[in-house]
Amino acid sequence: MKKTAIALLAWFVSSASLAATPWQKITHPVPGAAQSIASFANGCIIGADTLPVQSDNYQVMRTDQRRYFGHPDLVMFIQRLSHQAQQRGLGTVLIGDMGMPAGGRFNGGHASHQTGLDVDIFLQLPKTRWSQAQLLRPQALDLVSRDGKHVVPSRWSSDIASLIKLAAQDNDVTRIFVNPAIKQQLCLDAGSDRDWLRKVRPWFQHRAHMHVRLRCPADSLECEDQPLPPPGDGCGAELQSWFEPPKPGTTKPEKKTPPPLPPSCQALLDEHVL
């Protein structure tokens, strides 16, 4: 388990050592009315807000990476969720990566988070606030067993389930990505109130955090939403398929060349970087 924790920590800090992308040269939000542009995995943002790093309800991790920017709707969602968590006595919400000042591609660790509508939130709820040293080098708590088939009972809690449920019930949220084993546990514990489970989607990794995605703001005319998740709670055959062994001959997909930037994002780079 210690090796897994080290690997998770390395995943969270590895991007700092990779070559910078042009988007990292933009150090402040681009002025203008907030506009999320294009798709979550190939886009940018004008008029991003800065998430305040000081709050009684949440703490921001790895502030040295300057990934605490997003659409005003995302900032308000984080403030709303963390306030609800505090009201219920769940603990302090730990905020990971949002986006860069103008969005755009990261140098590693994320394919999305480009339009200011994504945020990673640790699935830990400390009752005592973390020190600055802990926040700069966060220790991810792996909730999933080594074989990936279930959560670790001693690490799972109803508070974590409540945090995910609170996020899923927010009207601005369209998807929450978690490890399949975490989704499975949520399905087992949900009882008869299951509508919110539709938004919780199984995905690779995500063993220690949830990745929350908001819908496109109505006034962001170039923003591209994903189709809604399939109807139902997602606890049936689709979820079970994640636990089946890979079919013979299955290979890892080749790394794709990033697609061309949308014209509005290319124009933004041309004006502010190139």
UniProtKB/Swiss-Prot annotation:
One of its GO terms (cellular component) is outer membrane-bounded periplasmic space. One of its GO terms (molecular function) is serine-type endopeptidase activity. It is an enzyme of class 3 (hydrolase). Its EC number is 3.4.24.-. Disulfide bonds join C44-C265, C187-C235, C216-C223. Its main location: periplasm. Binds 2 Zn(2+) ions per subunit. Zn(2+) ion 1 is bound in the active site. Zn(2+) ion 2 is bound at the dimer interface by residues from both subunits. Zn(2+) 1 binds at H110, H113, D120, H211. The keyword Ion transport does not apply. Its cofactor is Zn(2+). Residues 225-274 are annotated as: Disordered. Belongs to the peptidase M74 family. Murein endopeptidase that cleaves the D-alanyl-meso-2,6-diamino-pimelyl amide bond that connects peptidoglycan strands. Likely plays a role in the removal of murein from the sacculus. Dimer. HAMAP family: MepA. This is Penicillin-insensitive murein endopeptidase. It comes from Salmonella choleraesuis (strain SC-B67). The gene is mepA.
